[in-house]
Amino acid sequence: TLSYNSFDASLRGWIGQSYYGGELFSKIALKTQVPSYAAISGVVSKQKFYESDMLFYSDELPTFIINYDNHLRLQYGFAIGRKAKMEFGIGYGHLEDRFYQSNVVDFNSTSQDHTTYKLGQIIGKFEHNTLNHPLYPTAGSKATITAIGVTGKYTFTPASLNQGIVNTENENMTWGQVEVNLDKYFPLGNKFVLGTKIDVLGSTKKLVDNYTANIVQAPAFNPTPATKNYFNPDFRSNSFLAAGIIPLFKIIDNLQFRTEGCQLYLSGKYVKAPTIKY
């Protein structure tokens, strides 16, 4: 990481059993009446989901789904008071998915289907944050509203293409998406706090003909960090509503007991082929 008064730059990398990636990020603070900045970021990543979820590493598990995510983004943001900011950006992404249509196939003799997305994006994001801790807050609130416009091209190549049967599908795609995230913590005396959480996602994205391709690329609701590492089709949809509560007890200033419960409501109809099983 480099930092010089108004300029910051960083190069980061991650390596793990199911995920690895790299990010190059740089930001410069602009000399304007309202505090503002311009930034550029580039990300290259690969994530694998296995046929069976295991807590510890096992190299004998077949890779059921592989996601590649490569994108470049330019951003401009400015402050709104001391607790809020507005951000606008444009970007380009090359996304690639490789997957099996079923998890009951012979992984050694069956090839994976293959989809690619070449997408341009515009984004606007508003954030207001008064939480007293980035990971484990006990007071304050946070509201984030994100609007995205996407256009590009989708290509589906079935595994049968490797066997000499050409059946590639191409489709132009354009859609809009809005996401709202709300978190707020209410004190209930000196020791008890009740947190509330609401996540709403709405999208105009149309479904493609392949069920698994839709599910693999659909946004996922991840209530905990651990859920980001395994594939659950019941937590994926182009539009959803999630609401939850976070009861917590403050033992001392830097020690707390907290738990969380949430309910997820999915929207959107996916046509499931009879041979697909999860």
Predicted regions and their residues:
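Outer-membrane beta-barrel translocator domains and adjoining extracellular loop/strand segments
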Residues: E23-K27, Y50-S58, R98-D106, P137-A139, ...
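Gram-negative/organellar outer-membrane beta-barrel architecture
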Residues: T1-L131, P219-F221, P233-L241, L255-T259
